[in-house]
Design a protein with these regions (language model features):
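OB-fold and OB-like single-stranded nucleic-acid-recognition modules
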Residues: 1-255
Length: 255
């Protein structure tokens, strides 16, 4: 009979954010509240306030309020329809040219900060992130280098029993940006499964996405086949933003 190994204590990756700025707007998402924060360095960040409260205490927040927040990063799923894609462009009139487009649905992800503590009032300008995790993939755009980091922190959801008595967990994912492929003037070379701990700041990168790419993601690219001016429709573009951790220092752990 094979002896059973004793359970192993769980070890969690680091995942923390400290940030301050002014509330730009607020909106409801079910029982939760989402906030757009205008940060001192010109960045904008999305915050998630679970159940519209902190530790069960209701809050009073308004546009323009200066706040300081501590929390952690997650990727929040949301759905976008073809109708919403065209509404962003002010081109709902095109729905008649592409039957079925309004019903197409694409599952997307948005990076946000889950708020654990919040102070209202002027504060020292702050935008600090510490995250640790396993590199899932890397890519490059010109001289810029990026990585997707899988973070197994104490806030991750469990999904059944894993090995040696530990629960199986679903990672949080965040994107890292290494400006010019460097950290502190040193070139960075990464590969999948590298274990990193980074210090950085939150930043948004703007990009455009075509209707053709949206439909390809959503499995509805065939809808354009019979549409008039399908080529021009395919190239209709909407503006997107993606949130990254801009890496300012790096620890690359060895096994």
């Amino acid at each position: 009979m094979t002896p059973q190994l004793p359970p192993v204590e769980e070890k969690f990756h680091l995942n923390s954010v400290r940030i301050s700025g002014a509330v730009q707007r607020l909106w409801a998402s079910g029982t939760d509240v989402l906030l757009r924060l205008s940060v001192h360095d010109g960045e904008r960040v999305t915050l998630l306030l679970p159940n519209s409260s902190l530790d069960g205490r209701p809050l009073t927040l308004m546009k323009g309020d200066p706040i300081s927040v501590a929390g952690y990063l997650i990727e929040m799923p949301y759905l976008e329809t073809g109708r919403q894609f065209l509404e962003h462009l002010g081109r709902e009139d095109l729905l008649a040219d592409v039957p079925g487009l309004a019903q197409v649905v694409d599952k997307r992800m948005a990076t946000c900060v889950v708020v654990q503590s919040l102070q209202i009032g002027e504060a020292i300008p702050t935008n600090e992130v510490v995250v640790e995790g396993i590199v899932a993939r890397t890519w490059e755009k010109g001289e810029q280098r990026f990585a997707r980091l899988a973070i197994y922190d104490r806030h991750t959801e469990t999904d059944g029993e894993g090995r040696r008595g530990r629960p199986r967990r679903k990672a949080h994912y965040v994107s890292l940006h290494f400006p010019d492929g460097q950290v502190n003037g040193r070139k960075v070379t990464l590969k999948a499964r590298d274990h990193l701990r980074v210090l950085g700041r939150l930043s948004e990168r703007r990009y455009s996405e075509s209707l053709g790419y949206f439909l390809m993601r959503a499995g509805g690219i065939g809808l354009l086949a019979e549409a008039p001016n399908s080529d021009s429709l395919r190239e209709l573009r909407t503006q997107r933003v993606a949130t990254y951790v801009v890496v300012e220092s790096l620890l690359m752990f060895t096994k």
